Amino acid sequence: MSDWKIRFGTAGTSDSFAAQGYKSSLDVPEYTAKMGLNAFEYQCGRGVRLGLDKAAKMAALAGPKDILFSVHAPYYISMSSLEEDKRLNSIQYLLQSAAVCRALGGRRIIFHSGSCGKQSREAALEKALDTMRRAVEALDEAGFADMTLCPETMGKIGQLGTLDEVLALCAVDRRITPCIDFGHLNARTLGGIRSKEDYAAILDRMAEKLGDQRAERFHVHFSRIEYSAGGEKRHWTFAETQFGPEPVSYTHLRAHETVL
């Protein structure tokens, strides 16, 4: 029998973490459990700075509470860069993230693929696909074959990260799983996700491209995001209600591992 199940958690901590008297990353498991959550996406957006020993201690504290960690890799990953050095560095950032993720007892590494820059979307995607293939090879060679890379859908139109672009990256290897950020997709489509039918179309597209079993285990982000003509402008709080998760909550989500 599969041990997969739907999980809910936060990406990083909010102001409530300090307000409740927590000070250390070692407090994250207790903080998460008190909210009734069972997942936590550790943020390495500004660099992988969490030591492996501390990560292992966090994993030991999280295990009895059935909390599963994932890791968001550095924001400056650019798998589509015109500069080869930046593409190669991106692979190193994924390797660093994989090491921390394993120490945390997790398996999923979420990352932004990069931007199109001064090249066509097609050219940017080809570079990202090549970098992804090399990243998978590097992870395998480094002993991280059990890690799951999760390219994320992005909110700015100039970024690489439409639903189809992310699914193309996932086609590189069966171990790659999409991170579907519904807020980002809504922003880059200028408010194109309004109903449960819109959400269902996204889920159906994933199933079509990945097959039901892979599509059932995708990683999810949800946030309210303000957008302009270029897509994402800024993140909102959940107190701002122009775009919310209600339609997707009524859709039959076929996921077995979720971060909302």
For each predicted feature, which ranges?
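Active-site acidic/histidine proton-transfer and metal-coordination neighborhood
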Residues: 80-180, 187
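N-terminal pre-domain/capping segments
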Residues: 1-99
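Aromatic-lined glycan-binding groove of carbohydrate-active enzymes
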Residues: 198-230
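A contiguous pocket-lining binding segment that forms or flanks enzyme active sites
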Residues: 186-198, 202
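Short, electropositive alpha-helical surface patch
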Residues: 58-65, 121-133, 164-170, 231-249
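Active-site beta-loop-alpha junctions enriched in small/polar residues
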Residues: 11-15, 45-47, 74-76, 114-116, ...
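Hydrophobic faces of well-ordered beta-strands that scaffold small-molecule active sites
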Residues: 6-12, 40-42, 69-71, 109-111, ...
